C-alpha cells in the first residue's frame, strides 16, 4: 500500500506541476478541502516524512516496472463529449511514454534537467478485471449535469449524476468530462480529500492526442 501511495503522489505532483500555468485546479481544490479539514495538513506532513524516509531506504533498490490499472470514467451530456476508446488509449500511451522516458523528444531534454530525467519504471494500463469480471477499463455515463465546477463533487458519485470511483486502493480513477470555466483539470493528493474522490479529473478537450482534444493540447 505504501508503494501505491508513493507512486500516486509522484503522478499527481507531476500533473499539478505540468499544468501549473494552464489553469490546473489541484491547489485550489486542496486549499478548499483544508479549510474545512484542517487536520489533513498534519496528516499530509506526516505522509511526506514517511515518503522521504521510504525514498532514502530504497534509493538503491532494484525493482521491475510497476503497472497501475486505470479506469476512465467518461461522463458526458452529448455525443461530442463522449470521447472514443481510441482517444482514451492515446492518453494511456502518452503516460507510458512519459513515465518510461520513451517519448520521442527525450533526446531533447534540456541540459539542466538531464541529471533528473529517468525511466520511472511505472506503467499504466486500462483495467482488465473488476470484481472478478472482465472489463474494458472504460465506464460511460450520460448525465444531465451542466459543466462540472471546480468545487463540486457531483462528478464522483453515480447518484449525483456522475460516476462512482472503483476501489481507489486498487485503481487509478480518471474522470473525463466538461469542466466549467477555464479549468483544465485537477488531481487529488493523498490526504487531500475523500477517498471516494481520489483520482484525476480532466476536461474532454484536454485528454489524449486525437478526437475532441483542442489543437493546443494534442500531446496528451
Predicted segments with their positions:
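Bacterial Sec-dependent N-terminal signal peptides
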Residues: 1-25, 95
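Sequence-pattern detector for short linear motifs
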Residues: 5-6, 32, 143
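N-terminal zymogen propeptides
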Residues: 19-65, 99
